[in-house]
């Protein structure tokens, strides 16, 4: 009984957000976006990358001369902005001035079926579907971590469409199945049943994912859902957080939502 009372108190005392929402559309026409920890947005529109502030004011642009269509951007490291062109499995890194630093052709590293990548503070992760594994490389292309073949760990079919990482966790969205959690070294931790999740984000020890028009919060240390936030926004494709605001990509628009903790 004491355990359940304690658990109930934990759930009740978890931080929640007020349902009153102040929304602001700051960008129209984005294919993908990311944010760094300084509040800069990095927005992809086909083969062009825009760096903008939180009001949507353009600060810098980068245009790809090779005509690779970027499909993903990750700014977890503000000094190494990661871009991914999935058609040719090419990863590019820009500095904070959007100057090109390096280009990595993953096919030249014998990866021919890369479905998802993400940045990390000491390298980058990629998911190769043909091998059904996650691999982590440093910036000199030395392999520093890998998972077991995921088919040995899971019963569900694998269709990983996106991933994200911080200095504690790696999260993968397994489409129409759930979310896979690994530690920073690639050891499998657990899965969450989230068949309708559309995107994921890591915030310290918190996993945040979108499901329909809600944001769901999971404490990864407690393995506990702490709260849900209902929004007026559907088709959420990406979630970012900066300075008491969520930034959501939905229907090619970036929408800023201010929240106040209760």
Q: Each predicted region: which residue ranges?
A:
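WD40 beta-propeller blade core
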Residues: 50-51, 90-92, 135, 179-181, ...
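Repeated scaffold domains used in trafficking and secretory/extracellular systems
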Residues: 28-36, 67-75, 111-120, 155-163, ...
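A short beta-strand motif characteristic of beta-propeller blades
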Residues: 19-26, 57-63, 100-107, 143-155, ...
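Blade-level signature of beta-propeller repeat domains, shared across WD40, Kelch, NHL, RCC1
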Residues: 237-262
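Beta-strand-rich domains and repeat architectures in extracellular enzymes and scaffolds
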Residues: 24-47
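Bacterial Sec-dependent N-terminal signal peptides
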Residues: 1-23, 261
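Short loop/turn segments that connect beta-strands within beta-propeller blades
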Residues: 53-57, 95-99, 138-141, 183-187, ...
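Conserved beta-strand positions in repeat-built beta-propeller and related beta-rich domains
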Residues: 43-45, 82-87, 94, 126-131, ...
């Amino acid at each position: 009984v004491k355990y359940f009372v304690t658990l109930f108190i934990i759930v009740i005392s978890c931080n929640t957000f007020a349902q009153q929402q102040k929304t602001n559309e700051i960008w129209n026409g984005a294919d993908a976006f990311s944010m760094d920890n300084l509040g800069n947005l990095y927005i992809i529109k086909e083969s062009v990358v825009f760096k903008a502030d939180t009001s949507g004011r353009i600060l810098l642009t980068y245009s790809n001369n090779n005509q690779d269509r970027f499909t993903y951007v990750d700014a977890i490291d503000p000094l190494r902005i990661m871009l991914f062109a999935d058609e040719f499995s090419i990863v590019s890194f820009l500095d904070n001035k959007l100057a090109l630093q390096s280009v990595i052709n993953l096919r030249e590293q014998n990866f021919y079926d890369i479905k998802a990548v993400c940045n990390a503070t000491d390298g980058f992760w990629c998911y190769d579907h043909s091998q059904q594994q996650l691999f982590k490389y440093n910036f000199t292309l030395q392999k520093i971590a890998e998972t077991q073949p995921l088919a040995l760990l899971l019963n569900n079919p694998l269709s990983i469409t996106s991933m994200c990482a911080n200095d504690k966790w790696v999260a993968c969205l397994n489409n129409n199945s759930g979310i896979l959690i690994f530690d920073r070294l690639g050891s499998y931790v657990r899965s969450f049943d989230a068949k309708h999740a559309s995107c994921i984000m890591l915030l310290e020890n918190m996993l945040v994912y979108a499901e329909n028009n809600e944001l769901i919060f999971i404490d990864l240390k407690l393995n506990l859902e702490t709260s849900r936030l209902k929004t007026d926004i559907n088709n959420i494709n990406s979630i970012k957080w900066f300075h008491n605001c969520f930034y959501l990509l939905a229907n090619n628009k970036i929408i800023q939502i201010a929240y106040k903790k209760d």
